[in-house]
Structures are given as structure tokens and as C-alpha cells.
């Protein structure tokens, strides 16, 4: 009966709605049931309340024609467009920020090669416009406007419309041609010219009379002299001959001299070069849509504010930096310690050392209290704002560091320059590896600092409360203080807002701290009483059993015989 009575009292005390103990105030921080894992300098898996993904992995399945001007080469690459190949007439006068070359582009005229193809391609792409200026060239005693069956325009034999194929005259003459053009303008001129390589000696003399022919093009600072390479080659569009195209830039005040005795594919004018233009070229099969984006890749456009992307290493204009990582998360909240399902026996509240608080939704840091008036929770906005300001500043600085305009184009080399191509790819791979490592390190460093900052703000808040309460309360070691004086909700609020005056309550707190109180059912006393109750119950049970045996023996109901 005694043990049952004691257990009943314990249960009744635990289920009571009225709190009769000393007031308690606890400090805590926000928590969520499922946080986000981030990497720091010291740990690969740290759970935080919130984090921001820094790597963009989504792209649009199209190229955006705004705000950048895109020109679709369609079946023409940029060099064929500059030469004026049939099927490229839509590029006449075209202007672009990004010239889109298609993998399906084909040559549609006389078979040709460009010995320095990539340089010419780059010059044309960077220029951003096909601004062709026609000029008058006085060629003497030669036939002009040669045509070829390999170069059909509207099913009629034609030729590159920016070039003039010179052949011998009807009088079987091809005298020495020597022509000079002076650049009196204020811009650089790009001249594209060519040399025809016949397939046989007969073709050479039939076209130019002179065998061998020769073409020499000179400026004040350069000279290129080419002797035709006569010989049979594989047939392409019905032709075994070839044309080699060259290019010469003539600066303002310079001049260009054409000297030939045959085989010259002469220019009809020049392209105006714009040194201020920063256009480029992109080789991709992705269609042009109607979206808006400043970043283009060979896989589509990217629309994002994130500083990194792992979509493509080939990117144009205002693009995030390419990194190998699929994810880099920047902590934007504090360390997450999910709240336990139960907080000790009989609903005891706990502070930040044990866990976070999932109910603290209007701030990062806050208070919980328990007194005679009940329990309550309130956020501390000052410490919350201090942490947010520091984290926001870190986020802005990180984006500023990494959000430089990044432009990485695909570089190609002729097969003869294979070693250079391998070296270039090695350098690019090394740069990407280095930047990927730097990005990961930078994010880990910022995450470490973020967690340290938020932990520091929690400790600052705890120290502020401890200095206010001083000897009026006892630190319970779990982020809570037990207050040794009566503290109603107004008193609790003064602790929260920093206006608490410990001198007002000092005498009461000291008296209560040393006063001999009645038995207090703390966790330790409850255990002792339970053990005492259990022992007494066992003793009473044994005593009752012995008394029954003695009574039965006296009445003869039980006989006890002892044999020796």
C-alpha cells in the first residue's frame, strides 16, 4: 500500500498542469526536422538549417536570341559566308554577338582549303559583322568572273560572289598583273584572296597559259608568295583541282600589292574590321528559340544567378564558371540539431546544448521559459539579425568573387598541329581542375565561417543573459538557468530584452538559494524513494508469508517435521 501510494503521488506530480518549481529560462536556436548537408574544412557532412545551391545544372533546350544577337549560319559556316558561297546569301550584311555554326554546315562551291583556317574563323567571328566594301580593281588583259559547275547558284554555274576568278584572255594572254590598293581609311581592312591549283598541266595552260603560275601578295610588313601545286586530287563536286584561300590585314596607312602571272583568285573588295567588337562563334545543333539569356553553351542557354555551372565547359558571354562538381552548397543558416521527440521527464524544457527548437520560426535565436504563469517561446531578433547580416555579406562577397564574366570557347587546330592541340586541352583541363578545387575550397571555408559565426552569436546571447542574472540564477549546463526568485512574464521579458535589474531580486534569490526547503521531488529523490518503497514492499510480503506459516502451524494445518 505504501509503494502504491508513493507511485500515485509521482504520477500525479508529473501530470499536474500547475508548475510549482523555480522559474526556468532557456536559450535556444532554430532547428528543422530535415536539414541540409554541407561541407566544411573539417567535416564533409555538417547538417545546417538552410543552404543555397551554387552549381547550376539545368539549362534551356534552346538558344536565346535576346539580349544577344544571334545569327544562324544554317548550312553555311562563317568562312563560306565570308567567301560568298551559294546558299550563304542570307549572311550578306549580317551582324551578330554570337555566330551560330551548325555541325551540318557544308561547302557548296569549288573545293577549297584555308591554310590558317582557325585564325581566319576567329577574326571573322570577333568582328561581329559581314560589312563588305566593294572596290574597283583594274586587271589588264585577263578574263574575269570565272565560273564553275561545282558552284551552282539557282542551278546556274557561278562562283564565290566576294571573289573574282581571273583567267587568260580570249587572246590567249595572261600578262603580269601588278595592282596596288592603299588603305586611306581609319579602319583595318581584311582582304581574302586565293590561289587555284589545277589538277593537270593541261588545265594550267588552258586557264592561265603560263606554267607555272605564281601569286605574290605584299604589304609594308608582310609578303606571301605561292606557286600553284599542280596535281590530281580526289574528285569533289566534279572537280579534281583545289583553291587555297589566304587572308591579309591592311592597317590604316598601309597598302597591299597583288602581283601574279596566273592562278590568282582576286578579291572584289574588303571586309571592314571593327577592333571594338567582342563577338564570338558557337558550334552547336541547338535551335534558336524565343527565350532571354546572356549565357549560351553548346547544349543550350543558361538562365541563372548561381556562380557555377557544370553543364558545359564551352560557354559564351555572361556565364557562371564551369566546375566539375555536381553540387556545391553554401550554408545560409546555422548548424541544425533537430529537436528531440521528448525533452526529459515530465515535460522539462531544454536549452541549445541539448538540441535546437523546431517551433522557433520567427528568428534564429530565442528563449523558452517556464514559470507559475505557464510556458512561452520568443525569438531574439537582435542576435538573429546580427548573424543574418554576416551571412548575407559572405554570400554577396562569394558571388562577387566568382561572378566574373566568363567566356570559354572551343579551340580547334589542324591535324598538323596535333601536339599543340593536345597541349591546349591539357592546359584547359588543368585550369578547370584548379578552379573546381578552388571553388570547393572557397565554399568549404565560407561554410566553416558561417557555422562558427552562428555558434558565436548563440554563445554571445547566452553570456549576455548570464551576466544579467549573475547569482540570482544557476546555470543548469544545458543552456538553461534556474531562477531563485519569483519571476513572472514581465520579469522574463526584462531578461529577454536586456532590462533585467538583478539588484531588485538579489535578496530574495539569496534567501531562496540557501533556504531549507521541504522534500523536493527532483529526479534523484524520486529514484531513492522508489527503491525504498520497493524494499519495504518486499519486507512486508515476506513478513506476511512467515506470519501465515506460523498461524497454520499453531492450528495444526501445517506439520513441520525435522529429521536428523
UniProtKB/Swiss-Prot annotation:
Keywords, sorted A to Z: Clathrin- and caveolin-independent endocytosis of virus by host, Clathrin-mediated endocytosis of virus by host, Disulfide bond, Fusion of virus membrane with host endosomal membrane, Fusion of virus membrane with host membrane, Glycoprotein, Hemagglutinin, Host cell membrane, Host membrane, Host-virus interaction, Lipoprotein, Membrane, Palmitate, Signal, Transmembrane, Transmembrane helix, Viral attachment to host cell, Viral envelope protein, Viral penetration into host cytoplasm, Virion, Virus endocytosis by host, Virus entry into host cell
Stretches that traverse the bilayer: 528-548
Q: Which Cys pairs does UniProt list as disulfide-bonded? A: 26-480, 64-291, 76-88, 109-151, 295-319, 487-491
Q: Which Pfam families match?
A: Hemagglutinin (PF00509)
Q: Which InterPro entries match?
A: Capsid_hemagglutn, Hemagglutn_HA1_a/b_dom_sf, Hemagglutn_influenz_A, Hemagglutn_influenz_A/B
Extent of the signal sequence? 1-16
Glycosylation sites noted in the Swiss-Prot or TrEMBL record: 18, 34, 178, 310, 497
GO CC entries:
host cell plasma membrane; membrane; viral envelope; virion membrane
Topology with regard to the membrane? Single-pass type I membrane protein
Q: Does the keyword Transmembrane apply?
A: yes
Subcellular localization(s) per the UniProt record: Virion membrane; Host apical cell membrane
- Identify the residue position(s) of the site Cleavage: 343-344
Q: Which residues lie on this side of the membrane: Extracellular?
A: 17-527
Q: How is it modified after translation?
A: Palmitoylated.
Q: Name one GO biological process term.
A: clathrin-dependent endocytosis of virus by host cell
Q: Residues on the Cytoplasmic side? A: 549-564
Looking at the record's lineage, which domain of life comes first?
A: Viruses
Plastid is among the record's keywords: no
Q: Where is the lipid attached (S-palmitoyl cysteine)?
A: 553, 560, 563
Q: Molecular function (GO) terms listed?
A: host cell surface receptor binding
Other remarks on this protein: Major glycoprotein, comprises over 80% of the envelope proteins present in virus particle.
Sum up the protein's function in the record's words. Answer: Binds to sialic acid-containing receptors on the cell surface, bringing about the attachment of the virus particle to the cell. This attachment induces virion internalization of about two third of the virus particles through clathrin-dependent endocytosis and about one third through a clathrin- and caveolin-independent pathway. Plays a major role in the determination of host range restriction and virulence. Class I viral fusion protein. Binds to sialic acid-containing receptors on the cell surface, bringing about the attachment of the virus particle to the cell. This attachment induces virion internalization either through clathrin-dependent endocytosis or through clathrin- and caveolin-independent pathway. Plays a major role in the determination of host range restriction and virulence. Class I viral fusion protein. Responsible for penetration of the virus into the cell cytoplasm by mediating the fusion of the membrane of the endocytosed virus particle with the endosomal membrane.
Q: Which family does it belong to?
A: Belongs to the influenza viruses hemagglutinin family.
Per UniProt, subunit arrangement is: Homotrimer of disulfide-linked HA1-HA2.
UniProt-recorded name of the protein: Hemagglutinin
Amino acid at each position: 500500500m505504501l509503494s502504491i501510494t508513493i507511485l500515485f503521488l509521482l504520477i500525479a506530480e508529473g501530470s499536474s498542469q500547475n508548475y510549482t518549481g523555480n522559474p526556468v529560462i532557456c536559450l535556444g536556436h532554430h532547428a528543422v526536422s530535415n536539414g541540409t548537408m554541407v561541407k566544411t574544412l573539417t567535416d564533409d557532412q555538417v547538417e545546417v538549417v538552410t543552404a543555397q545551391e551554387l552549381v547550376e545544372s539545368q539549362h534551356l533546350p534552346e538558344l536565346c536570341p535576346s539580349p544577344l544577337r544571334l545569327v544562324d549560319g544554317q548550312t553555311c559556316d562563317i568562312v563560306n559566308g565570308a567567301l560568298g558561297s551559294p546558299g550563304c546569301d542570307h549572311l550578306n550584311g549580317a551582324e551578330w554577338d554570337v555566330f551560330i555554326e551548325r555541325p551540318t554546315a557544308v561547302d557548296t562551291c569549288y573545293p577549297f582549303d584555308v591554310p590558317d583556317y582557325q585564325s581566319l574563323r576567329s577574326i571573322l567571328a570577333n568582328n561581329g559583322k559581314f560589312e563588305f566594301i566593294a572596290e574597283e580593281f583594274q586587271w589588264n588583259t585577263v578574263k574575269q568572273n570565272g565560273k564553275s559547275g561545282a558552284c551552282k547558284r539557282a542551278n546556274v554555274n557561278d562562283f564565290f560572289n566576294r571573289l573574282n576568278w581571273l583567267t587568260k584572255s580570249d587572246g590567249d594572254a595572261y600578262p603580269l598583273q601588278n595592282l596596288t590598293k592603299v588603305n586611306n581609311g581609319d579602319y583595318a581592312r581584311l582582304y581574302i584572296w586565293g590561289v587555284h591549283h589545277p589538277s593537270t598541266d593541261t588545265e594550267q595552260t588552258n586557264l592561265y597559259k603560263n606554267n607555272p603560275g605564281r601569286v605574290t601578295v605584299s604589304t609594308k610588313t608582310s609578303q606571301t608568295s605561292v606557286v600553284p601545286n599542280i596535281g590530281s586530287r580526289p574528285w569533289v563536286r566534279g572537280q579534281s583541282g583545289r583553291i587555297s584561300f589566304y587572308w591579309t590585314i591592311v592597317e590604316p596607312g598601309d597598302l597591299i600589292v597583288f602581283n601574279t602571272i596566273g592562278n590568282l583568285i582576286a578579291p572584289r573588295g574588303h571586309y571592314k574590321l571593327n577592333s571594338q567588337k567582342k563577338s564570338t562563334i558557337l558550334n552547336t545543333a541547338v535551335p534558336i528559340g524565343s527565350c532571354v539569356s546572356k549565357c549560351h553553351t553548346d547544349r543550350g542557354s543558361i538562365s541563372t544567378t548561381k556562380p557555377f555551372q557544370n553543364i558545359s565547359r564551352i560557354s559564351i558571354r555572361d556565364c557562371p564558371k564551369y566546375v566539375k562538381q555536381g553540387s556545391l552548397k553554401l550554408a545560409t543558416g546555422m548548424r541544425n540539431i533537430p529537436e528531440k521527440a521528448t525533452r526529459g521527464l515530465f515535460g522539462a524544457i531544454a536549452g541549445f546544448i541539448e538540441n535546437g527548437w523546431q517551433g522557433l520560426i520567427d528568428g534564429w535565436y530565442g528563449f523558452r521559459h517556464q514559470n507559475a504563469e505557464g510556458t512561452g517561446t520568443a525569438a531574439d531578433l537582435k542576435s538573429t539579425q546580427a548573424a543574418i547580416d554576416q551571412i548575407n555579406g559572405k554570400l554577396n562577397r562569394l558571388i562577387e568573387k566568382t561572378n566574373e564574366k566568363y567566356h570559354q570557347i572551343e579551340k580547334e587546330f589542324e591535324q598538323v598541329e596535333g601536339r599543340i592541340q593536345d597541349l591546349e586541352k591539357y592546359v584547359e583541363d588543368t585550369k578547370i581542375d584548379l578552379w573546381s578545387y578552388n571553388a570547393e575550397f572557397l565554399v568549404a571555408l565560407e561554410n566553416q565561417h558561417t557555422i562558427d559565426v552562428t555558434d558565436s552569436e548563440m554563445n554571445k546571447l547566452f553570456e549576455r543573459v548570464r551576466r544579467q542574472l549573475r547569482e540570482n540564477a544557476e546555470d543548469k549546463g544545458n543552456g538553461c538557468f534556474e531562477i531563485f526568485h519569483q519571476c513572472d512574464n514581465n520579469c522574463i521579458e526584462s531578461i529577454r530584452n536586456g532590462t533585467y535589474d538583478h539588484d531588485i531580486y538579489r535578496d530574495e534569490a539569496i534567501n531562496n538559494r540557501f533556504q531549507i526547503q521541504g522534500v523536493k521531488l527532483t529526479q534523484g529523490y524520486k529514484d531513492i524513494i522508489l527503491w525504498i518503497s520497493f524494499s519495504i514492499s518486499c519486507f512486508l510480503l515476506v513478513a506476511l508469508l512467515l506470519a501465515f506459516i506460523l498461524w497454520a502451524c499453531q492450528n495444526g494445518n501445517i506439520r513441520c517435521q525435522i529429521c536428523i
